[in-house]
Amino acid sequence: MGKIMKPGKVVLVLRGKYAGRKAVVVKQQDEGVSDRTYPHAIIAGIDRYPLKVTKDMGKKKIEKRNKLKPFLKVVSYTHLLPTRYSVDVAFDKTNINKEALKAPSKKRKALVEVKSKFEERYKTGKNKWFFTKLRF
């Protein structure tokens, strides 16, 4: 059987604080490592989705409603539901790694990078479905 979790694959988080949120696999670890013996992945997702905007809203209101809040997390495969979709966002692997998630200052830098990549993608209008809240 082929590998399902690949970088760029869109997944749904099933458990925890971010349950029901869409995320993208940044790096996968199929066999596990010494500190985490189970298969897991580093994911970057959207915690707070942008709100709906209409043409009769002002510039300030549109700017406020277009904000999104990202998250970075190491999650076990059992808590992820892979989809058939993928998003081709190229994250910098030197900034986004397990060491960066442990140190608060590095994590902040990584989150800023993720936010900029997602906002750039959102503003260009690519992958519109990824930036909408999952209705269930």
From Swiss-Prot:
The molecular function GO annotations come to: structural constituent of ribosome
The top of its lineage is: Eukaryota, Metazoa, Ecdysozoa, Nematoda, Chromadorea
Provide the protein's localization. Answer: Cytoplasm, Cytosol; Cytoplasm; Rough endoplasmic reticulum
**What's the superkingdom here?**
Eukaryota
Q: Where is the KOW domain?
A: 5-36
Keyword Cell wall biogenesis/degradation appears in the UniProt entry: no
Q: Keywords, A to Z? A: Cytoplasm, Endoplasmic reticulum, Ribonucleoprotein, Ribosomal protein
Originating organism? Caenorhabditis elegans
**What does the subunit comment say?**
Component of the large ribosomal subunit.
Q: What InterPro entries has UniProt attached to this entry? A: KOW, Ribosomal_eL27, Ribosomal_eL27_CS, Ribosomal_eL27_KOW, Ribosomal_eL27_sf, Translation_prot_SH3-like_sf
Q: What is this protein called?
A: Large ribosomal subunit protein eL27
Outline what the protein does. Answer: Component of the large ribosomal subunit.
Q: Which family does it belong to?
A: Belongs to the eukaryotic ribosomal protein eL27 family.
**Where is it mostly found?**
cytoplasm
Classification via CDD domains: KOW_RPL27
Gene Ontology annotations of biological process type: translation
Pfam families reported in the protein's UniProt record: KOW (PF00467), Ribosomal_L27e (PF01777)
